[in-house]
Structure formats: structure tokens, C-alpha cells
A protein has these predicted regions:
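Active-site lid/adjacent beta-loop-alpha segment flanking the redox-cofactor pocket in flavoenzymes
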Residues: 85-168
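Short glycine-/acidic-enriched loop or helix-start segments at secondary-structure transitions
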Residues: 32, 62-64, 91, 115-117, ...
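Mid-domain beta-loop-alpha active-site segment that forms a flexible
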Residues: 1-13, 56-58, 123-130, 175, ...
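Central helical "cap/lid" subdomain
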Residues: 41, 45-88, 120
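Helical element adjacent to the flavin cofactor pocket in flavoenzyme catalytic cores
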Residues: 1-50, 58
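C-terminal catalytic lobe of FAD-dependent flavoproteins
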Residues: 3, 135-215
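A short, compositionally biased micro-patch
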Residues: 32-33, 75, 99, 164
Length: 215
């Protein structure tokens, strides 16, 4: 799955369904009164009977405003991208992924460095060396770009799906596998949110699993 094509398709579908997208609309506060959420943002006030927090690392700050916890942390990963080449990879791999256009995306690094998103030569060199040893033909291919980004990590690495008891209609969703889980989120989870309650299967991913005293 090409994540860029997937994101574009989901975004277009969102707009087709009369969704409204606001950029640079940082949220400052959320209140809940008589079944209605009031969200204060850089782009103004918004009210709705249902609220889904899917702000990635921002959920750590926002979730407590609706009575939930989202103990997420940033984990940096770096990626190298090769020139376009003929089809080489036809099996799933964690280190190497080939796009439909032919470029190979290389990388599975994990760095606990807070919110630092700078690229580092030593990590990129390690990634390139592992790729060369995994698939020797890559040694002669050019790297055309690279970048670093932050994963949204829970304490155990698995998703966190929660619904608020003190603010009914409020949900918090966190994962670092958005592309892999897109189908489940679009169909199963969306239906549960519309119904106002997570199914038993999703409830097992609640943040409460980290509360030893509650278990």
C-alpha cells in the first residue's frame, strides 16, 4: 500500500462526505456540558455531540480534558529512499519496502530522543549497511532523499482506543500503524463511534490495560 495514495484517497472521501478540514487549528481547550463538546482552537470555537481525539502525540495533552489518559511518547525513525528501479521485492519486509513506482524505502530505526526530528549520518549509514547486506543489489543504487519522523508510541507499542465515561461521546484513538490499520479504522471503528460505543474487541485496547491495580 502506498501511504501517500491512501492518505489522498481517505482525504478526498472525507471531503466528498462533506467533511471540513482546517489546517493550523491548534486546540487549546475542550469542555463538555449537557451532551455537547466545545472545542477552543486557533481557528475558533466548535461544538459537536461527538468528539474523536486523533491528534497523535498531542493526545497526551488533550485526552485528560475529556477524562481519559493517552500515555504516548515520540520515537524517531529514519528513512532512505532509492532511485526508481525494476521490481525487486514481492514479499513483506520490515526493513525494505518497494513502492508501485519502483523506489525502495529503507529503514526500521528506533531512537528514543524526544521530539528531535533531525537526520543523523551515523543512523543513516547503519540503515544503508543493513540494506546492502540484506539485498546486495542495492549497493549500486542511488539514495535520492531521506528524512526522519516521529512514531506515536504507547507503552507496549500497541494501539490505544478509549471512550470517555465522564464525557459520553468522547473518544481517543492512538496508534503508530495508521496505514496497516486503516481498513479496520474506516469500517469497524467508524461504525462503533457512530453507534456511540466501542465493541468488546476494541475495548481490549483501552489504556486501562496499563493500570495494574484495575486488572
Amino acid at each position: 500500500v502506498n501511504p501517500l495514495y491512501l492518505l489522498k484517497s481517505l482525504y478526498n472521501c472525507f471531503l466528498t462526505c462533506n467533511g471540513q478540514s482546517l489546517h493550523d487549528a491548534e486546540v487549546f481547550d475542550i469542555t463538555h456540558d449537557e451532551g455537547v463538546f466545545d472545542v477552543s482552537s486557533r481557528k475558533g470555537q466548535f461544538q459537536a455531540p461527538c468528539l474523536v481525539l486523533a491528534a497523535g502525540l498531542g493526545n497526551r495533552k488533550l485526552a485528560p480534558l475529556i477524562g481519559l489518559k493517552q500515555p504516548v511518547r515520540p520515537q524517531k525513525g529514519q528513512i532512505l529512499v532509492t532511485q526508481k528501479i525494476d521490481k525487486l521485492i514481492d514479499v513483506p519486509m520490515t526493513l525494505l519496502r518497494q513502492t508501485a513506482e519502483g523506489s525502495i524505502m529503507i529503514g526500521d530505526s528506533k531512537e528514543e530522543v524526544g521530539f528531535d526530528i533531525s537526520s543523523s549520518i551515523d543512523i543513516m549509514a547503519q540503515i544503508a549497511d543493513r540494506a546492502r547486506r540484506t539485498l546486495p543489489v542495492l549497493e549500486k543504487q542511488q539514495i535520492i532523499r531521506s528524512w526522519a519522523a516521529l512514531r506515536v508510541m504507547s507503552p507496549d507499542g500497541f494501539p490505544m482506543y478509549d471512550q470517555s465515561e465522564v464525557c459520553p461521546g468522547g473518544f481517543a484513538i492512538t496508534c503508530h500503524s495508521g496505514v496497516t490499520l486503516a481498513a479496520a479504522h474506516c469500517f469497524d471503528m467508524a461504525a462503533d463511534i457512530e453507534a456511540g460505543n466501542f465493541s468488546v474487541g476494541l475495548q481490549s485496547f483501552s489504556e486501562r490495560r496499563f493500570d495494574v491495580s484495575a486488572n
